[in-house]
């Protein structure tokens, strides 16, 4: 399943990338490909191909992720994507 996660937070793009890169290895269990678009400082769009939605949801609700979200007041909006052609 392809999804888009739009994250808005009170930090920098570098803050987000540090968190993303630190958790990327763990996430290899549930995704195969991704692209990150920087909308502006404090807002990114992550397009990602999820292979195991249950593991993705576990990662998104982990203590580590909740702590990051609280520290940076992060709000994630998750959209499903479908190829249209």
Task: Please annotate each region the language model reported.
Residues 1-68, 72-85:
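Short S/T/G/P-rich N-terminal loop/turn motif that feeds into the first structured element of a domain
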């Amino acid at each position: 399943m392809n999804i888009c996660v739009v994250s808005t937070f009170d930090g920098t793009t570098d803050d987000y990338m540090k968190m993303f890169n630190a958790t990327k290895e763990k996430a290899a269990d549930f995704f195969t490909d991704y692209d990150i678009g920087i909308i502006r400082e404090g807002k990114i769009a992550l397009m990602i191909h999820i292979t195991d939605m249950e593991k993705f949801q576990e990662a998104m609700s982990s203590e580590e992720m909740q702590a990051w979200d609280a520290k940076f007041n992060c709000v994630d909006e998750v959209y499903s994507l479908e190829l249209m052609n």
